[in-house]
Amino acid sequence: MLSRLFRMHGLFVASHPWEVIVGTVTLTICMMSMNMFTGNNKICGWNYECPKFEEDVLSSDIIILTITRCIAILYIYFQFQNLRQLGSKYILGIAGLFTIFSSFVFSTVVIHFLDKELTGLNEALPFFLLLIDLSRASTLAKFALSSNSQDEVRENIARGMAILGPTFTLDALVECLVIGVGTMSGVRQLEIMCCFGCMSVLANYFVFMTFFPACVSLVLELSRESREGRPIWQLSHFARVLEEEENKPNPVTQRVKMIMSLGLVLVHAHSRWIADPSPQNSTADTSKVSLGLDENVSKRIEPSVSLWQFYLSKMISMDIEQVITLSLALLLAVKYIFFEQTETESTLSLKNPITSPVVTQKKVPDNCCRREPMLVRNNQKCDSVEEETGINRERKVEVIKPLVAETDTPNRATFVVGNSSLLDTSSVLVTQEPEIELPREPRPNEECLQILGNAEKGAKFLSDAEIIQLVNAKHIPAYKLETLMETHERGVSIRRQLLSKKLSEPSSLQYLPYRDYNYSLVMGACCENVIGYMPIPVGVAGPLCLDEKEFQVPMATTEGCLVASTNRGCRAIGLGGGASSRVLADGMTRGPVVRLPRACDSAEVKAWLETSEGFAVIKEAFDSTSRFARLQKLHTSIAGRNLYIRFQSRSGDAMGMNMISKGTEKALSKLHEYFPEMQILAVSGNYCTDKKPAAINWIEGRGKSVVCEAVIPAKVVREVLKTTTEAMIEVNINKNLVGSAMAGSIGGYNAHAANIVTAIYIACGQDAAQNVGSSNCITLMEASGPTNEDLYISCTMPSIEIGTVGGGTNLLPQQACLQMLGVQGACKDNPGENARQLARIVCGTVMAGELSLMAALAAGHLVKSHMIHNRSKINLQDLQGACTKKTA
C-alpha cells in the first residue's frame, strides 16, 4: 500500500517537474520572506546588544565548532568522491543540486527558528552537513540514468520512489525521534544541537520527496539529446545493479525500526506531556536565551547601517576559525576538480564507444585481419596490434582472422550505418579506451558474477568467452545481453557467437552486418534477439507531382525494374500536369469479440450500443485513454452468442493499433459494468481486420481511405509510355477488373499496388505485413479529352494503414526517408496531417506504378524489360552458397 502511494507520488513529481520545482522554491522563498518581514524586530548586534552572546563566543566552544566544520566538509568531500567512482557527471551535478537546495531550505528553517538571527547558522550548518546522506539521492538518480527515454525516466523515478520512499520515511522518523531525545536533556547547548539535527533530517526529507525527483526528471529531459540515438546520460550498466530486489529493505530491520519508533514516541510523550507539562523549557525559548535573544538581558541600540549592509558585513567578516574552514574547503575542491578527474577517468571510463569514440587509424598488414563477425573475442588477432596494446579490449572495429580460408574470401562486404567517412579500407579503426587487462582463460562463474554485479566494473571487465560461459550456465538470459553489456553492439556480437556455434555452417552470419548500428532505438521497440540488420537497396522515384507539390519517393526493394517503372509513371504524371488526391476517411479499427449467455442477450447489447446513449458512454471511456484517440463509430455483428464490435477511431500521426487497442480495452471494461454477464473473449476477434484479406476493410475502410486521379495527354501516352490510350483501357478492363473478378479477388483490382506499397513501407519504417490490407486498390482507366485520346486514370485505396510516429519510424535510416517526403514525426499544427499526407503519397506512387506497368503490358515490353533489368549477370556457380558449393 505504501509503495503504491510513493510510486504515485514519484510519478506525479517526475511528470510535472516545473510545477514541483517552482512550488518548492516559492514556498521556501515565502518562508524566508516571512522571516525577514514579520515576527520579532529585535536583531542581535544591529538594533540590540546581546552581552550574553559575547560571553558564549569567547568560550572554548570555538575549537569544537571548528573541528566539527572541518569534519563536515571532509564528510561531504568523501561522499562526492564515492559518487565520482560511478563515472557519471550527471549524478555529480544532481547530487550537488540536492546538497545546495537542501542547505538553502535548512538555512531558511533555522533562521525562522532563531528569529532572524544569522549567527546561529555557524553552529547549525556543520550538523546539517554531517547528517546529509547523498547515497539515497544518488541511488534515485541511478534509477533515472538507467533509462533509454524520457518516459522511462519517469517510470524509473516512480519505481525508485516506491522502493526508497517507505525506507527513507521510516529512517527520517527514527532519526528525528532519536536525535529529539537530546532536546530533553536540560543542557541548553545539547538541546540546540539536537534541534539542528532534527531540522536537518526534516529538510533533507522534504527536498528528497519534492524538489529532488523533479530536478532529476527535468535535468535529464533537458539533456536528452543524443549522438547516434542513445541518450547522452544513459548508463546501461546501472540497469542490472539497480534491480528491485537489491534495494528492497530488510523486513527484520524495518520491524525493529518501527518498534524503536513506537518506544521513542512513548518516551517523548511521557517527558513532554506527563512528567513536565509546563512549556517553560521549550527548545525555542532555550535557544533564544542561549543565543542572547532574551529581552531581559538585551539592550536596544540605534542601528548605524541598514539591515542589508549589516547582514552583508557579517557574511564578509571572517574569524580565524572561518578562515581555517574555508581554506580546507577550497583545497579539497581544487584537489577534487583538477587532480582527481584524470585519475578517475584513467581507471574508469563509462563513456559509450558508439556515442563518443576517439578514433585513430593504425595500419595493419594486408590480409592479416578481416572486418567480419567473430567466434572468439580477442583470442585471435594480429601480432602488430597485440604488441601495440598488450591487452584484450573492446574495439570500434574488432580485428580477428577469417573464419574460412583467405583464398575463398578475397572480398568482404562492408556496411556502415552512420558516418562512412570513418572507414578506410587499408586501416583499422581503434577506439582509444582505458586499458583493461583480461585473462586469456575464462574465470570461474562465481568470480565473473561478482564482477558483473560490481557497479564500478561491470561487463566490460569480462571477456566475451566469460559472458558466453555465464549465458550457457543460465546466469544471464540470452535475450538480455544488450541491456547487460556496456554497449548494445557487444551484446549483439556475443549473441552471434552463441548462434554461430549452433549452426551447421558456423560462417553463415559473415555477410550479415551488425556493426555501426544504433541498437538503442531497436531495443524494446522494433526487434528482439537481434543478430544484425538487413541492408536493403533503396531507390528513389520522382519527382511525383501530387497536389501541386513535388515528392522524391524512397522505395526499398530487391525487385529489378520496380523503381525504374515507377519513375517512368511519375514522369508521365508530371508531364500531364500532376495528380490530385483526397483523403476520404481516417480511422483505425479494432474488432474484439465478446460472448453473452444467450444470443438474445447479444442482440440487446448490440441494440444498446447503437443508441446515442450507449455510444456516448463507450466513447467517453474510449477517448479518455489518449489525447489523440477519438471514437468515430461502432460497427457490430452477431454470430450466435458472440458479439463482434468494430471500433473505429482516429489516431493522430500514429498508425494507431496500440492506441486503439488501449481504448478498446477501456471501453470493454465500461461495457462490462453495464452488462456484467458479458465475457470478453479477445480484444481482437479478427473483425478489424488486421494483416489478413478481408472484405470489411475493402468496403468499410481501415486506416486512411484515399483516392488519386490524373489525366495523361495522348502525346505523353505515345512518347513516354510507348502505347495508346485505347490499348491501356482494354488491358485494364480485362486484367484488373474481369481477371481479378474471375480469380475471386478481394480488393485486388489492380496490377501491382502491393509492390509499391511494400517498397515504401520498408523504406519508411512501416509494418510491412500490413501491405495485405493496405494494398487494396481499384485502378480505373477511361478515355478523356476533346478527342477521347487522353487517358484518365484513378486509384482508390480504402485501407492504407500507415503512420509517421512509433515503431520502425523511430529508426534513423527510416526517419531519413520520411524526411525526404517532409512527413517525419508528428504534425504539431494539425495532428494526423503527416500520416494523411504520407497516405496520399503512397496512393499517388501506386498510380504511377500502375500507369507504367499497364503501359508495358499493353505494349508487350514487360518480359523484355525484366530480362534486361531483373536478371543477375553473376555466375552463381562461382559463389559459395547453401546448395551450390565449389568442389575442392
Swiss-Prot record:
Q: What is its main location?
A: endoplasmic reticulum
Glycyl lysine isopeptide (Lys-Gly) (interchain with G-Cter in ubiquitin) crosslink: positions? Answer: K89, K248
Q: Name one GO biological process term.
A: regulation of ERK1 and ERK2 cascade
User: What does its activity-regulation comment describe?
Assistant: Regulated by a negative feedback mechanism through sterols and non-sterol metabolites derived from mevalonate. Phosphorylation at Ser-872 down-regulates the catalytic activity. Inhibited by statins, a class of hypolipidemic agents used as pharmaceuticals to lower cholesterol levels in individuals at risk from cardiovascular disease due to hypercholesterolemia. Inhibition of HMGCR in the liver stimulates the LDL-receptors, which results in an increased clearance of LDL from the bloodstream and a decrease in blood cholesterol levels.
The EC category is oxidoreductase
Which stretches are Cytoplasmic in the membrane topology?
1-9, 79-89, 150-159, 221-248, 340-888
- List where the protein spans the membrane: 10-39, 57-78, 90-114, 124-149, 160-187, 192-220, 249-275, 315-339
Q: What is the effect of changing L546S?
A: In LGMDR28; uncertain significance
PROSITE patterns recorded: HMG_COA_REDUCTASE_1 (PS00066), HMG_COA_REDUCTASE_2 (PS00318), HMG_COA_REDUCTASE_3 (PS01192), HMG_COA_REDUCTASE_4 (PS50065), SSD (PS50156)
Q: Which GO terms describe its cellular component?
A: endoplasmic reticulum; endoplasmic reticulum membrane; peroxisomal membrane
* Location of the motif INSIG-binding motif: 75-78
Q: Which residues carry this modification: Phosphoserine?
A: S504, S872
How does this protein lie in the membrane?
Multi-pass membrane protein
Protein name per its UniProtKB record:
3-hydroxy-3-methylglutaryl-coenzyme A reductase
- Organism, by scientific name, is Homo sapiens (Human)
